[in-house]
Amino acid sequence: MRISKAKLSNKLSSLPLSCLALGLALSFGTAKAGDFPTAKVNTTGLAVTDTTVTVGILHSATGTMAISETGSIQAEKLAIAQINAVGGVLGRKIEVIQEDGASDWPTFAEKSKKLLENDKVAAVMDCWTSASRKAVLPVFEKDNGLLFYPTFYEGLEQSKNVFYTGQEATQQILAGLDWITKEKKAKTFYLIGSDYIWPRTSMKIARKHIEEHLKGKVVGEEYVALGDTQFGSVINKIKLKKPDIIYAAVVGGSNVAWFKQLNAAGLNAKKQTMLTISVTEDEVLGIGGENLEGFYSAMKYFQSLKNPNNDAFVPEFKKAYGGNAVIGDVTQAAYLGPWLWKAGVERAGSFDVDKVVAALPGYELTTAPEGYVKVDPNHHLLSKLRIGKWRKDGQADVVYESELIAPDPFPKGYQ
């Protein structure tokens, strides 16, 4: 489905410029299309005209992952509307073709192929799960497409065709485990995740870190099918094992059942400590703050984060999507994707993928809602880890913030 600037919504296009939008507008100035002839800035047949450039948005608008991915769609559309409001990219307005991955990995691959081969989009804001990313990666590498991936993930990957705006394992998993172990003097851990590549690989990394570096013990490890809502058996095992920490990577709609059933079974934060690496404000909308009050999440961004960038960003997001709208870690990382793409294109002076890829590493963004980030040569971002303690109102108090952590997607000893 093609979405023109007008159809992005009058509400979005009339928003005041954010701190991020103003900062980038000042950094790049106002590029005029006449200064960048199409024949020179588009030598590979992308969907670029003298007045427009087309990008793709591909997330799950339906299915079990829609609870998590809707925020990414909203954030990317907001960023694109703001970019258009400051003159677009190389003087061209961005048009969007949006597709629905429908929480189905083959569908993601099929839609990616359509966007790249038929629609000739200049870039795609794509995926949430690692399973969907793994499904589309061969398509992007074959067709030399450009993917901005917003989700925290297991690492152990690096592609010329992907920029990863979420955190990899050493930034989220290892730093989070270090904090919770020290803070709670934890010795025993129970690992639980959804049954696909990200939770399984993440738990493999977590187990190794717990046992070899933290000298702890994993007393249980369980995986549930994506979309599963029956957690009674797992909860009974946890009650029997009595771990110091539940370490969780349950995703999508399963999270709603998981936390509600935990609470109903009496395993609330007063009796059990949990650190999750998969719950953001987006998921809390469905889970209900009362069902995870006092539990912890390890993320680089929380909506409650206090800094001038975020103080400007949150009201604008709510103005676009309503006062009850929330912003989670992946939503904020998704918001960065269009802005980083704009930066790469304008540094390169071209929409050609190879030139954008070469231009973006080293770029420093000081106006992101999360704070300073920098694009590493390995296509990940330098960023901080934060630990949030959930409140009943569905927001989190940030109780820990690390220094900037350099991304290391292939950590020695964890491969």
Residue ranges: model-predicted function:
Residues 34-42, 46, 53, 361-415:
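Solvent-exposed, acidic/polar segments of extracytosolic/periplasmic ligand-binding ectodomains
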Residues 40, 108, 165-189, 200-201, ...:
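Hydrophobic alpha-helical segments within soluble ligand-binding/sensing domains
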Residues 61, 162-226, 245, 322, ...:
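An alpha-beta-alpha
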Residues 261-335, 346-351, 400-415:
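Extracellular/periplasmic periplasmic-binding protein-like sensory domains
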Residues 115-127, 148-150, 190-193, 242-252, ...:
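Periplasmic-binding protein-like
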Residues 203-298:
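Extracellular/periplasmic bilobed ligand-binding domains
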Residues 1-54, 415:
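Short, low-complexity disordered leader/linker segments with a strong preference
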Residues 36-43, 52-54, 67-74, 82-156, ...:
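Beta-alpha junction/loop-to-helix N-cap segments that form part of ligand/metal-binding clefts
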